[in-house]
C-alpha cells in the first residue's frame, strides 16, 4: 500500500528537485533593484510607501536565522519532504510503528515489504508513544499522512493511518494538549448536561451558558493562556506594532501630499495656459477691425 502512495507522488518529487536546482543563490533585495531601475530610467518611479515597505522587509529578513528568505524556507521544506519520502521507501515508518508504538500484526494478513497495511496500534500505546517522538519521526508521520487523497476509498486507507489521523485530530496533541483522550469524557466536551426528550410539537430552545462547557477555560493550561490573552500584548510587541502603524501613517501622508502637490501644479499650469490664450484671442478678434494706414497718393482712390 505504501508503494502505491510513493508511486503516485513520483512526479511531485521530480518537480521539487527542479525547484531546488533552479535557484541556488539569493536574489538582491527588491528595493535595491527598484532604485537601480529608477536611476537608469528603466522603470517608472516607485511610490515612497512601497519603498518603505520593501525596505522594512529587507531589514526584517536580516534578523532571520542565516538571513533566510521565503524562497530559502520553501526550498528547505521541499528538501525535508524529499528526505522523508526516501526514508519511507527504506521502511523506516514500519520500524517506527513496530518498535516505538508497539504495533502488532493483524491476523489473516500478509506482510508485503515495507507496507504498513498489516499493522494495528493498541490505543493506549498511541498516547504514550506520540509524546516521545522526535522532530524527524513526527515529520515522517506527517508526510505519510499527507500522501492520502480525499478521493481515496476509505477501505483502501491503512488502519494505522486511520488511527494516527484520529489521534492527531482528537488526541492530547497540539491544541488539545492536556485534554483526556482515554478513560473518561474529554474536558472540552461542549454539553455538560444531558438533554431531555421532547414530544412532537414541543419547541427546542437554545441551551443556557451554564449548561455548556467553556472550551477556553476547561483545563488549567487553557485558562492560563486565556488570562494572558486578556491582558494584551507584551511591551516589546506593542512597541513594534505602534512603530509599524506610525511608519504606515507617515508613508500615507507623504503620498497624499505628493499627490496634492501634483494636482495643484496641474491646475496652475492650466490656469496659466488660459491666461496666455485670452490675450491672443483678443488680438485675433480686433485684428480684422483695424485698417492699415494709406499713403497720401492712395486717398484719391477712396
From Swiss-Prot:
Protein's cellular compartments: Mitochondrion membrane
Region of interest (Disordered), residue spans: 20-44, 264-290
Transmembrane segments: 236-253
Superkingdom per UniProt: Eukaryota
Annotated transit peptide: 1-21
Main location: mitochondrion
Extent of Polar residues compositional bias: 277-290
Similarity-based family: Belongs to the GEP7 family.
Function: Involved in respiratory growth and required for cell survival in the absence of prohibitins.
Protein name according to UniProt: Genetic interactor of prohibitin 7, mitochondrial
Organism: Lachancea thermotolerans (strain ATCC 56472 / CBS 6340 / NRRL Y-8284)
